[in-house]
């Protein structure tokens, strides 16, 4: 039975318990990761070499090896003095991510990597090869403090923030695998980076934004990825969105909305209790005005919870009230998570939801979900170690 667009009903909300985490904005204090060359701003690299007794220009040489040539073996960095390589590596190239498990799907073109950090914390990233691009979904925190009840990461709670280098190294590790032809499809290089893995990136603002700068800065200062290929996802930290808009980077902003009404979003996305739907959308519009980059609205479709056509219509009205041509909606079929009783919307309901948005003139594309069979899709990253049983 369908509900007319103009007669919304109040459904009971069979929401999951809050789980182990509450809404956490500040990461727990833990020992800092060792300083890595990637943590240094370009202007700091020469002085760091001088501290080691080397010439300042060695900083640029090391940057060329790391970012441009994707070299991680000091023995092959032949433009650095052989007698200095070990000392430089020990001081500036500590191991940050230790791979402990790799799972593949889609004929080997979707790869989920589980890494152990220096303190035992676990994070995951997912590399996805498409015909015209190579995209990696990366983590900005170990765990997440946003406590969204339909997301495996949010239910795990927040362990700690990642450093700039820990974030970037997920990308360089994937780029090395592509460059060395270790992934089906021939040699390649990461072209797109989405901050949609574990964590709320804007809650780890300093490290996440510094990581974006390393990604988009031309080699040898960084990896030289186009800012258009970088997507910063957020549940709606309004002050941080406004701050990011002024960074001069012009990456794509993705707002994880999941409901157009405060009553439901308060439950699905607890940060909404601090910044309401209207405030988040206003900030997203300001981001568009500051950067010229069209904003993506992410909307996980949950059966009988938020997938009603009238909610799509309400969302369309809210977006159009803030102008035309500034936004695109990505409905996402809900991916299953361990212990969750929620499921994805029926295909007919999904089509009706999309049609309601399109009837309001809102560009809408259902997200191509990959990696769900290896718990590598949106909302599924939980960094379960090899020794931990799956639910």
Curated annotation (Swiss-Prot):
Sequence segments annotated as region (Disordered): 1-33
Gene Ontology CC terms, in alphabetical order: cytoplasm
Keyword Chaperone tagged: no
BP GO terms, sorted: rRNA base methylation; tRNA methylation
Subcellular location: Cytoplasm
EC class of the enzyme, as a word: transferase
Protein's name in the database: Probable dual-specificity RNA methyltransferase RlmN
UniProt source species: Kineococcus radiotolerans (strain ATCC BAA-149 / DSM 14245 / SRS30216)
């Amino acid at each position: 039975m369908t509900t007319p667009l103009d007669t919304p009903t109040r459904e009971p909300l069979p929401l999951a318990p809050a789980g182990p985490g509450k809404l956490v904005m500040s990461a727990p204090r833990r020992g800092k990761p060792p300083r890595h060359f990637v943590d240094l701003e370009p202007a700091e690299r020469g002085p760091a070499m001088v501290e080691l007794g080397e010439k300042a220009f060695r900083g640029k040489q090391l940057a060329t090896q790391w970012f441009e040539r994707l070299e991680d073996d000091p023995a092959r960095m032949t433009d650095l003095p052989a007698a200095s390589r070990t000392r430089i590596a020990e001081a500036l190239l500590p191991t940050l991510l230790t791979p402990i498990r790799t799972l593949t799907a889609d004929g080997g073109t979707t790869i989920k990597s589980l890494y152990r950090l220096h303190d035992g914390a676990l994070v995951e990233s997912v590399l996805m090869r498409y015909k015209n691009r190579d995209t990696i979904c990366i983590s900005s925190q170990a765990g997440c403090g946003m406590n969204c009840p339909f997301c495996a990461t949010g239910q795990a709670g927040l362990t700690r923030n990642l450093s700039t280098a820990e974030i970037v190294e997920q990308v360089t590790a994937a780029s090395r695998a592509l460059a060395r032809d270790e992934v089906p499809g021939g040699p390649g290089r990461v072209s797109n980076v989405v901050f949609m893995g574990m964590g709320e990136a804007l809650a780890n603002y300093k490290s996440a934004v510094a990581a974006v700068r390393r990604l988009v800065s031309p080699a040898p200062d960084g990896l030289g990825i186009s800012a258009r290929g970088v997507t910063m996802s957020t549940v709606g930290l309004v002050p941080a969105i406004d701050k990011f808009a002024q960074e001069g980077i012009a990456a794509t902003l993705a707002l994880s909305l999941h409901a157009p009404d405060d009553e439901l979003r308060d439950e699905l996305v607890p940060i909404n209790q601090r910044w309401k739907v209207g405030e988040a959308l206003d900030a997203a519009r300001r981001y568009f005005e500051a950067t010229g980059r069209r904003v993506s609205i992410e909307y996980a479709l949950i059966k009988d919870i938020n997938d009603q056509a009238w909610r799509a219509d309400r969302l369309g009205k809210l977006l159009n009230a803030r102008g035309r041509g500034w936004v695109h909606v990505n409905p996402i079929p809900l991916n299953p998570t361990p212990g969750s009783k929620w499921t994805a919307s029926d295909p007919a309901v999904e089509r009706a939801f999309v049609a309601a948005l399109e009837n309001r003139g809102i560009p809408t594309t259902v997200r191509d979900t990959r990696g769900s069979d290896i718990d590598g899709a949106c909302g599924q990253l939980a960094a379960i170690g090899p020794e931990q049983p799956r639910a």
